[in-house]
Amino acid sequence: METSSSSPVKPRRKDKDEDGRAEQEDSADQVGEPHRKLLRLGDILETNEVLLNEAYQQPELTKWLQTAWTEEKSQGTKETQTGAQVFSDPFQICLLPGMLEKGQSQALVAEIIQKVQWSRKQMDLYEFYQSADLSNMPACRLLTNFLQVLRKQVRPWLEKVTNLKLDYVSASCSMYTCGDYLLVHDDLLKDRQVAFIYYLSPWEGAEEWTDEQGGCLEIFGSDDQCFPQFPVQRKIAPKDNQFAFFKVGSRSFHQVGEVTTFDYPRLTINGWFHGDTNEAFVADSLRAFPRLNYLQPDGLNRPPLGLFLNNVYLKGATRRSIQKRIEENSEICLYEFFKREKFELARSQLLADSDTLKWRRQGPANAHNYEVLDLTTARGTILELLQLFRSHAMFDLLRDFTDLDLAGTDAESPTCSVELQRWSHGNYTVLGDGLTSEENTLDLVYYLNAAEGAAVITYLAPDAEMPTAKAPTDGRRSDYDDEEEDDSVLLTITPVDNALNIVYRCEGTTKFTKYVSRNTPLEKGPVFVISCSYKE
């Protein structure tokens, strides 16, 4: 099949003006939310400068932190006077409650609400609001002063505590409203040595968040290959006027859990202390995610397509029409692909059979988080459909649909991978998860028990995940401006029951499945996806 080298997958786009208006309205609504919280701040301290808590400037505390930082106490250790805590497992992290003098966090929040301009950051890894770098915000007097405190007081103090050479600091403000999140990453980039988060939540009754409100800093352990593993090992809830910092390394995996409260935004000042090139950076850049397992067609199984497929897709004229559409657009969606009774039987079995079917969580956590079926436990209609996708009959059909050499005398050694996935709240895949196509590939995506907003797949142009832009201050990859994001998106697949999506993607094309927010309605239960890839 011939495809355009400039457009591996041709997208169906919305009107840009319409998208822009909707985004502006949504952004205005959400950015305006913190302003209403100003009324609940109470009396705001009139101050011209940010002052560190004197308790953290005492030599005795510095010495205690130095000792605690180097000790290997997995359960952590706590200082009685300040409540400072240090944990070494799964990596070194320190919590300093009451970092600034009383009333300072209120004054900072008031200035943030009144003066900070927010930019919406939205990609596979994150959704939240971010300010400019504090060094570029001269109108924000207290924030500028906070940056100076980090530079002149906190940086040399951290050098003593951590025994690391720290040259400079970068910082910005982040705001997470309900539904926002930042998925698993390690912060490891070039010269980052120590990451920090200063929490701002001075609202009465919300000084320390509960687990039900979300927004926790969630810490992950990792395996022998430095891949983060489920479940979350430690949670640190937002707490007003608390300063957290940790050593950036090949195991410093963490995420910001989805904010689930509409009452308050999660506000922080966050960034990094930088030094020499991080020693762990080179090794991390060579770490590869696991790849899909490709198998040859199942020669023992050749099910009659007429028992399963909608009869319209067996007609020669329909096949030729599909082939022409795929040749022109590199994709097509075939509605009501299977006979309705087969689809209903399969969906019912997936929802009801909790004893026989065995599922396992698919990791590592910095690549993906969803469940996959142990195919050896498949029975009944589910087994029949899975066998069909790997059968010679399906390879023959896909040859007719696409003109690819997946069957016949010109076929050399065609292969496929078949996976049955289960998607619920909190599930995702991210860019760079091993699903970048290293050669031309035909993807099939089939939904059962579909729900709007769950298991939505986005295809991006080659190299779209690595634009030449500045690094974000609360994530691992580069920022995207609106134009770059829009132009890089080739196709978005939205869930539709009993619809087979066929996508031909060229070498270098990548994809991700958007994080399933807790706000996504899943009243009918989880969404199931049969995901297949075929190679000539």
UniProtKB/Swiss-Prot annotation:
InterPro entries: Oxoglu/Fe-dep_dioxygenase_dom, Oxoglutarate/Fe-dep_Oase_C, Pro_4_hyd_alph, TPA1/OFD1_N, uS12_prolyl_hydroxylase. Its EC number is 1.14.11.-. Residues 165-275 form the Fe2OG dioxygenase domain. Residues 1-35, 467-486 are annotated as: Disordered. GO terms for biological process: protein hydroxylation; regulation of translation; regulation of translational termination. It is found in: Nucleus; Cytoplasm. SMART domains: P4Hc. Keywords: Cytoplasm, Dioxygenase, Iron, Metal-binding, Nucleus, Oxidoreductase, Vitamin C. Prolyl 3-hydroxylase that catalyzes 3-hydroxylation of 'Pro-62' of small ribosomal subunit uS12 (RpS23), thereby regulating protein translation termination efficiency. This is Prolyl 3-hydroxylase sudestada1. The gene is sud1.
